[in-house]
A protein has these predicted regions:
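Short, small-residue-biased leader/transition segments that mark boundaries at the very start
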Residues: 1-5
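Beta-propeller blade signature
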Residues: 6-15, 67-72, 123-137, 197-209
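Surface-exposed loop and turn segments in beta-propeller and other repeat-based domains
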Residues: 15-44, 80-96, 139-156
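Structural signature of eukaryotic scaffold interfaces centered on beta-propeller domains
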Residues: 31-58, 97-109, 156-164
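Short consensus segments that form the blades of beta-propeller domains
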Residues: 60-61, 118-123, 194-198
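Conserved beta-strand positions in repeat-built beta-propeller and related beta-rich domains
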Residues: 62-65, 112
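Loop/turn-rich, solvent-exposed surfaces of beta-rich toroidal or solenoidal domains
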Residues: 95-164, 172-173
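Blade-level signature of beta-propeller repeat domains, shared across WD40, Kelch, NHL, RCC1
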Residues: 163-216
Length: 216
């Protein structure tokens, strides 16, 4: 028996709705539960928020943690599978979820998250960053570094889209930039920005923009 998650989109032109269905065997929660019956304590933890709907040129990519398939939803309302994972998340214990980050015409930035949490150390949900190269048809582990630092400083490639040009953004506290500037860790444009900051300055917003690219 298969289940499916149902979402709807609403037309801005005439207000009509269309249902979107993503099939899967059973709904899987991302939460890890904790209970202490003697103390009457019950709570759960979940990993960081992940974007289930990601803009991709004139389409949208749909991710459901209970499904083994990632879909591209087109403007003509066709839903096309673009990634099929194996082994099935339905067969894993603990489950390892697959989430997508920034998408380009060549690369898919992805992340796996293991449904595992230690309530004593308050650590868990270990992750692995993966990159799929559509041209080479290969998957790699990856790290993206910020070239405005003299040392290796990783950039989070999670999708936080602003519009079709800005794929994601990150906030950097002014105090952290001032400290890095004084220690000589900055260069290029970020060094120039940090030189003008003080402790009362607002955080600096770093934008991750798409290069000009054609629809894949």
């Amino acid at each position: 028996r298969q289940m499916c998650i149902r979402d709807s989109i609403i037309s801005k032109q005439d207000g009509t709705t269309k249902q979107i269905q993503i099939p899967f065997k059973e709904k899987i929660s991302m939460a890890v539960n904790y209970s202490d019956k003697a103390k009457d304590i019950y709570y759960n933890v979940i990993p960081d928020n992940y974007n289930p709907i990601i803009p991709y040129f004139d389409c949208w990519v749909l991710v459901e943690q209970s499904s083994d398939t990632v879909y591209k939803y087109q403007s003509d309302h066709k839903m096309i599978p673009i990634i099929a994972r194996t082994p099935s998340v339905q067969s894993m214990n603990p489950e390892v979820f697959l989430f997508l980050g920034i998408l380009t015409n060549r690369y898919y930035f992805m992340e796996t998250v293991k449904k595992e949490y230690n309530f004593e150390t308050h650590e868990g949900f270990p992750t692995t960053d993966l990159l799929y190269d559509k041209q080479e048809k290969a998957i790699f582990e990856y790290i993206v570094y910020n070239n405005d630092y003299s040392e290796k400083r990783a950039v989070n490639m999670k999708s936080l889209p602003v519009d079709d040009k800005i794929a994601s953004w990150q906030s950097i506290e002014a105090s952290q930039l001032i400290e890095d500037y004084e220690k000589g860790k900055l260069k290029r444009r970020l060094k120039e920005i940090a030189a003008s900051l003080d402790e009362e300055s607002n955080p600096v917003i770093m934008l991750i923009k798409h290069k000009k690219q054609t629809n894949p």
